[in-house]
């Protein structure tokens, strides 16, 4: 595990599952993980995806196109987001999904990819599948397994999920 890099728990919400088919980000949530494991500075932004939200995605996170159309576009928030995460190691649950969407958004605005800005990525889904192997590894299952209070979370949300991820990461990295 990195010790010299700043750690940031990150989660996203999207219009659907496939950035290669035009699905877009609708929310980014980031929470710094301090050296004592506590949450630090945070960044959260709703985003106008410039397209409708699929019914399936809306059931997951509760955001509709009507709720998002007045939010800034990714191009408008890219600098603030990248400044927040620059030089950090990102802690992401199912990193392939989130990094795929972030890279797709960065490509649209000609800003390279996440690897250009961040030191690395720790995928807590991969960690969870190793410790102990064979057990459910969803964020919900890990919160339950580690007795993390997720009662304030009725739907997925990038910010609340990144806050829960701080606790899940701390629990996973304390396991032998």
Regions found by a protein language model. Name each.
Residues 157-169:
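Acidic, divalent-metal-coordinating active-site segment for phosphoryl/phosphodiester hydrolysis
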Residues 1-118, 129, 133, 137, ...:
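Conserved non-catalytic scaffold segment of RNase H-like nuclease domains
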Residues 144-147, 166-171:
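Non-catalytic, well-ordered alpha-helical segments in soluble enzyme domains
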Residues 1-2, 168-176:
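Acidic two-metal-ion nuclease catalytic site recognized across multiple nuclease folds
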Residues 100, 125, 163:
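Active-site phosphate/pyrophosphate-handling residues
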């Amino acid at each position: 595990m990195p010790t010299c890099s700043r750690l940031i728990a990150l989660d996203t919400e999207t219009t659907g599952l496939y950035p290669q088919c035009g699905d877009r980000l609708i929310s980014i949530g980031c929470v710094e993980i301090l050296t004592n494991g506590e949450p630090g500075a945070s960044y959260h932004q709703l985003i106008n995806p410039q397209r409708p939200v699929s019914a399936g995605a809306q059931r997951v996170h509760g955001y509709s196109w009507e709720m998002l159309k007045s939010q800034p576009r990714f191009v408008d928030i890219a600098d603030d987001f990248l400044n927040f995460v620059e030089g950090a190691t990102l802690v992401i649950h199912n990193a392939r999904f989130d990094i795929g969407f972030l890279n797709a958004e960065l490509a649209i605005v000609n800003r390279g990819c996440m690897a250009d800005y961040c030191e690395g990525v720790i995928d807590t889904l991969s960690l969870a599948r190793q410790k102990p192997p064979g057990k459910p590894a969803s964020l919900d299952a890990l919160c339950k397994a580690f007795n993390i209070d997720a009662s304030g979370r009725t739907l997925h949300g990038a910010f609340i999920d990144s806050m829960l991820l701080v606790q899940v990461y701390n629990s996973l990295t304390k396991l032998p």
